[in-house]
Amino acid sequence: MPSIRAPASKQTATLQVAVKCRPLTDSEQRRSRHIIQVIDDKNVVVLDPDLSKDYLELIQNRTKERRYSFDHVYAPGCSNADVYKNISSTIAGVVQGLNATVFAYGSTGSGKTYTMVGTHSDPGLMVLSFRTIFDLVKKDDSKDTFEVSCSYLEVYNEVIYDLLEKSSGHLELREDPVHGIMVAGLRSIKVHSADKILELLNIGNSRRKTESTEANSTSSRSHAVLEITVKRKQKGQYGSQVLRGKLALVDLAGSERASETNNFGQKLRDGANINRSLLALANCINALGKQNKKGLAYVPYRNSKLTRILKDGLSGNSRTVMVATISPADDQYHHTTNTLKYADRAKEIKTHVHKNIGHLDTHVEDYKRMIDNLQVEVSQLKKELAEKEHQLSVKPTEKAADNELSWLNILSQETGENVQERINLQKALFELEETNKRNRMELQHLDDAIARQQVKDKDSAVLQALTSRRQVILDNIRDNDEAGAGYRKDIELNESRKRQLQDMIEEATSNNGNRTYLHILSQYRLLGMTNAELQIEMAMRDQVIYNQRESLRSLWNIIYGTGLNQKQISKLAAKQGLTIEGCPLPVSSPDVTTPPSFSPHGRLSPFMSFPSPQSQPYSPSACFVQHGFSTMSYLRNQHETPTVCRQEHLSSYYMMSECSPFDGDGKQKTNGRSMPYFSTPGKPKEMYNFSPGTESERTPCSKEYPTSYSRNGDSLVQIKVNSLPLYTKTMIGNL
């Protein structure tokens, strides 16, 4: 029997920013001056490093002195334990099913790795965090059982490696519609004590790429992410509720200048890749900080694998702490101010936190069987590969075979990278176009509101605010169009490289003696490209399904907002011969404020439709419907009353006289608004290619369907979503 309850409530949290200043080193004490002052544990002052300025320049405010305020500021004498005291509450939520992210940000040599990893006498935030988790699990007096697992990866030169595997290959990122960004093939180890995680942490750190530079004798050349997952479930009960909390502890590599490090060769290339990924992170921080002021700014997560991994921590379902590490030396002034500048912008970032609640059911056993079968298949393939390698090693023309195999491996790797790059570019372009679509929808509403306001009062403050907001949206659209042009150019270059690789394969097939093998390789790679491109469509479909679940939850809120309880709804449905697909509603009356919950598996059932209940009056209060990116207010018989409509994700307000999507005759006014979807059991609507959105532009997965109408004379509700018209009889249309 389906349960009816509200979805997990979301809380908005602001990214917490702490600044930690390390002491001067022995060499810095001889050649540098201390320029950092900490005031009241929340304010930091960076003094002007130039002491040669005269009095006139100082009184004319020609100084480089900078002042910043943060949640917490730690002087050079503070230990890692002092930092951890103020962020431990964030870590404790992981045991309750919440996500948390802690990352250290700063230039090379500023103390990031020391802060995150620490030493035996001064343990870092990583060590203190997993000790807290196991202490909380041990002290828990409930009957719940806990399962703790951890993984450890690094991002080196835009390639992901597993630090818990002795000889890890290249790992790829995958997007899961439920769990978000995941690393395919990453090893996750179950642990039962903090000492075991510490052992794994030491093993991973020994495999991490580090080099000695003039700026830092133990410079980290990669970004490292330690992820701890805590699953909490009731003991001995099948089908019980499961809470899944995740803690991500990130030690970033430091930005550096080639002129300061005097690097060359591989070290120089490593530094360039580090700076490129950190620049992508800085751009994401800028865009997220700008969203509260300028609205729908595109966030370029796909410009780097690091930013894709940190996506949840920066703007998704996570409570996040950023520890900015700085050096007090005067010759590090520019690095220090740059770090504090981005940390100051990060204070504006907001995340949306909710518990990760799941239920165990029969699908789990199916997945386990599939995994077991795949593991058996992988073992067989590894065995066959070892036999083939042995056969190659005993051939008389061993050197020639090795050269051919090396060439094939390089070609295979380049082809895979080309396909993955094209997927990321196409997804990024799709996301950017969706952002611009919403911008243009808001621009249309603003133009309508400005036109109405000009008729009333041309000099009002409301008109000025609307005009200013309109200019901000136009700037966002222009910036996004420029970014889109850059993505299209990159896609063209990627396609050109794809053709080059195909030509190389065809040439080798025609010239090499082993033509059959190369022909098979060519066909395999071409099929691999096709399969990878189909994954894009699958990811889009997953997003469609997720959006549809949210729409159905909103529809239940609308139904209960009319004043009907579950018993009344069941009676109305029975009179019209309407039932829920699967099984009927229970007779007991739930809280009218709670919509039904749906299983995370399956095709978004159950669906319902009801006739308009004439006997039930509509609630006189406004019904605010949270849907996607907007909140719409429906007021019965007040269609011409000016209403303040609010775009919640933009924190912007503007006047609209026709917020209701229906006119006096009961006909819908679409105005680009997405509407709920209902269907009858006799003619259920297909969910194929359905996506809540607007009719202003078509999406890549939009599809035309024939128009259908209700036959019994009731008022019609036309639903247009991404050029997909659907007609159905609902009680919402008669309100």
UniProtKB/Swiss-Prot annotation:
Molecular function terms from GO: ATP binding; ATP hydrolysis activity; microtubule binding; microtubule motor activity
Keyword ATP-binding found: yes
Keywords: ATP-binding, Coiled coil, Microtubule, Motor protein, Nucleotide-binding
UniProt keyword Heme, yes or no: no
Residue ranges of coiled coil: 354-395, 424-454
Region (Disordered), start-end ranges: 664-684
InterPro entries: Kinesin-like_fam, Kinesin_motor_CS, Kinesin_motor_dom, Kinesin_motor_dom_sf, P-loop_NTPase
Signal peptide bounds: none
Swiss-Prot/TrEMBL GO biological process terms: microtubule-based movement
Top-rank lineage group of the source organism: Eukaryota
Binding residue positions for ATP: 106-113
Disulfide bonds: none
Entries under PROSITE patterns matching the protein: KINESIN_MOTOR_1, KINESIN_MOTOR_2
Family: Belongs to the TRAFAC class myosin-kinesin ATPase superfamily. Kinesin family. KIN-8 subfamily.
Name of the molecule in the record: Kinesin-like protein KIN-8B
